[in-house]
Amino acid sequence: MEESQSELNIDPPLSQETFSELWNLLPENNVLSSELCPAVDELLLPESVVNWLDEDSDDAPRMPATSAPTAPGPAPSWPLSSSVPSPKTYPGTYGFRLGFLHSGTAKSVTWTYSPLLNKLFCQLAKTCPVQLWVSSPPPPNTCVRAMAIYKKSEFVTEVVRRCPHHERCSDSSDGLAPPQHLIRVEGNLRAKYLDDRNTFRHSVVVPYEPPEVGSDYTTIHYNYMCNSSCMGGMNRRPILTIITLEDSSGNVLGRNSFEVRVCACPGRDRRTEEENFHKKGEPCPEPPPGSTKRALPPSTSSSPPQKKKPLDGEYFTLQIRGRERYEMFRNLNEALELKDAQSGKEPGGSRAHSSHLKAKKGQSTSRHKKLMFKREGLDSD
């Protein structure tokens, strides 16, 4: 009991007496003035809302002033790209057209152009000069773009690229050209190889250079870095090369195109396709107006075959000296007569020939017997 009584006599640190002493230390007036502590509303609401609430009630309620929504900025200007480039010929105001040097169909040629088919035949990674003709000089900063597309409609939306084998075989000689690009420019360090950000098509662009003194055209040397028969690449699908003349903003000033086949023997393939073209009797594609592509003269092989004349039924007498020669010619004649009779071309004539042949054969045998009898009589004498 004594211990508990002693504990009650000890004042706790925050007992009632201690609190009363602390309360007396506070000032008598303005205990909760705004100078000592901020208002509760100010602690919970932003300053703009508090000022709006403190305004006179007679004024119409207004929302706090906020900045007006700004219009969205213009979209970045991307160059306009068509998903399927047009191969249609468009000379434009500058009379843009293409030309090719005259080339034969020998086995040794590395490239050859067929005006009849409007088609270029070339070997892998061989230089193919293409002439650019204009009727008037284009504006400064004009460029020339080359792009490959598939010719058939079922493949035209696909991107023409090299096969995986040739893409892996790229070496340091490729220079700035990416390994997947099919068309490359030779001898021009200012060539740019581009991938369209919308269609992912490959193209190569070079600045347009005016013709040199004494020349009427500009020449660009192109290379094709994959065969048309490569699996995983073109895979025997025909392609077109589109050459466009463009200004600095990408607007097309002129356009032209031609078909391309990359093969091992350009001369042989050109001869074969031209012969098949004549056999089919397809109309010759008209070259673009003002083009320097010369069409081949029409071949005589396309004319209809002439009908064979009927056999002549007239008989002729041929005098032959010597029996051996006579027998030889007689056997030859009999063989020809038998051939005509078996072919059935002249049924009436063959019968007449056969009957005449039998009569002549009978006469020859009788004469032969008479000669034999005479010889035997001389021997017996």
Curated annotation (Swiss-Prot):
Entries under Gene3D superfamilies matching the protein: 2.60.40.720, 6.10.50.20, p53-like tetramerisation domain
Motif (Nuclear export signal) spans which residues? 327-338
- Residue numbers spanned by region Interaction with AXIN1: 103-280
Stretches the record annotates as Transcription activation (acidic): 1-44
Q: Which InterPro entries match?
A: p53-like_TF_DNA-bd_sf (IPR008967), p53/RUNT-type_TF_DNA-bd_sf (IPR012346), p53_DNA-bd (IPR011615), p53_tetramer_sf (IPR036674), p53_tetrameristn (IPR010991), p53_transactivation_domain (IPR013872), p53_tumour_suppressor (IPR002117)
Q: Which residues carry this modification: N6-lactoyllysine?
A: K107, K126
Stretch list, region Interaction with E4F1: 244-282
UniProt KW tRNA processing keyword = no
Q: Which cofactor does it need?
A: Zn(2+)
Motif Bipartite nuclear localization signal, chain ranges: 293-309
Task: Tell me a Gene Ontology molecular-function term this record carries.
Answer: ATP-dependent DNA/DNA annealing activity
Q: According to the UniProt record, where is the region Interaction with DNA?
A: 261-268
The cross-link Glycyl lysine isopeptide (Lys-Gly) (interchain with G-Cter in ubiquitin) sits at: K279, K280, K339, K345
Region annotation Disordered: where it falls in the sequence: 55-84, 270-313, 338-381
Cofactor remark from the record: Binds 1 zinc ion per subunit.
Stretches for region Basic (repression of DNA-binding): 356-375
Q: Which CDD domains match?
A: P53 (cd08367)
> Which residue numbers mark the site Interaction with DNA?
K107
Cellular component aspect of the GO annotation: centrosome; cytoplasm; endoplasmic reticulum; mitochondrial matrix; mitochondrion; nucleolus; nucleus; PML body
Residue numbers bearing the N6-acetyllysine modification: K107, K293, K309, K361, K369, K370
Renumbered to this chain, region (Interaction with HIPK2) spans: 307-348
Sequence positions bearing N6,N6-dimethyllysine: K358, K361, K370
Family membership, please give it.
Belongs to the p53 family.
Function statement = Multifunctional transcription factor that induces cell cycle arrest, DNA repair or apoptosis upon binding to its target DNA sequence. Acts as a tumor suppressor in many tumor types; induces growth arrest or apoptosis depending on the physiological circumstances and cell type. Negatively regulates cell division by controlling expression of a set of genes required for this process. One of the activated genes is an inhibitor of cyclin-dependent kinases. Apoptosis induction seems to be mediated either by stimulation of BAX and FAS antigen expression, or by repression of Bcl-2 expression.
- Protein name, per record: Cellular tumor antigen p53
Q: Which organism is it from?
A: Canis lupus familiaris
